[in-house]
Amino acid sequence: MTPATPDVPPATADAPGPAPESVPEPLPLSAARGPRSVVLAGGGSAGHVSPLLALADCLRRRDPQVRIVALGTQAGLEARLVPERGYALATIPKVVFPRKPSAAALRLPGALKAAVDAAGAALDEAGAEVVVGFGGYVSSPAYLAARARRIPIVVHEQNARPGLANRLGARLTPYVGTTFAGTALRHARVVGMPLRPEIATLDRAARRAEARAAFGLRPESPTLLVTGGSLGAARLNGAFAGAAADLSAAGVQVIHVTGLGKEFVPETGSGSGSAGGAPYVVIPYADRMDLAYAAADLVVCRSGANTVCEVAAVGLPAVFVPLPIGNGEQRFNAAELVAADACLLVEDARVTPDWVRETVLPLAGDPARLARMASATAALGRRDADEALADLVAEAAAEGHR
């Protein structure tokens, strides 16, 4: 994001790395030949798969002949999304690294060896010249298999706080790209988050009329987007369902993406609001998030890394509600935007119908404040991260051919 959007190292692996001089100097792009074959390892969640596919598209644009193979599992989103995008997918067993002593921990060595062997076979079959890992279950086996074969490794970390797989990967390579400044990985360089083309190229103002018409909204009314991602967010759904009548009566129209199977009929009447109030449109899933962003003046959402970066790239004011689980990475993902007064952040437990009425409704009706937030957000956004990460891949490939 900052320039200038379904794992076993020691704890010291996320400490700051060696002095900058240990990192190879970037090669001039004219001297950095792109790889002929790349294996992209990552999957499980959209947070890993989306940047993987964005990089794949960028590499293919640069060289239509490059061979690209994604490495994932049969159970992750990649099993559907990668083939749909036209790329080959090789699968390996899913290996979960237990955080506490358990029977699963006793089985880990054998399971990890099987996954590394399967990853190695995929690298050999692809003739991989570079392996790019995005974290998640498949990245650790891919990193270990690549290291054993002396194949250059590139790591991309999406979150402000790195996961275990990428802590391991960063110990094995100097080619480490991060989304956020300050991510504690060795050799880290900020490249941003590779975004899907329809988001990276979005002109919200130019698409606003089309987008609002697509959702059945009024052309000029204040517009709020509420989304908890593809799985939805029960806290957001409950709070906004309870305040739907107030939003509609105040003239604030809403696109509410609830998650599959979590739709509701707002109190205003039909799914698009009552005749007298502003529309309240409830949908389970938005397959055109570019249009949802273009239609909105404000979004209330979780602060996953991909979402934070998409919102910043398109300059959309946001109220972030970090998911209150994991290692707290969602709070850290939004930290830079919060510090710049480009967005608001609220704890999950505070999100209630009363909070929507007292905080979100006045903000949605304050165009001057939203304009200031939009400007601050856009100033921190980055749209060229796919190219920056592809440059890092080219560097690694050139180093491997020296």
Regions found by a protein language model. Give the residues of each.
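Acidic donor-binding loop of glycosyltransferase active sites
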Residues: A128-V130, A294-T307, L316
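Conserved nucleotide-sugar phosphate-binding/catalytic loop shared by glycosyltransferases and other
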Residues: P35-A46, Q65-D117, V191, E347-A349
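C-terminal alpha-helical cap of glycosyltransferases
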Residues: P3, P28, R382-R402
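A short, well-ordered alpha-helix in the C-terminal region of glycosyltransferases
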Residues: R369-R383
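Conserved donor-binding/catalytic loop of nucleotide-activated donor transferases
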Residues: R149, A294-A296, E310-V321, A340
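Active-site-proximal region of nucleotide-activated glycan assembly enzymes
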Residues: R147-A209
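Donor-nucleotide binding loops and adjacent catalytic segments primarily
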Residues: R33, G76, L81-P83, R207-A213, ...
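Glycosyltransferases and closely related glycan-assembly transferases
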Residues: A118-V131, S139-V154, R167-R171
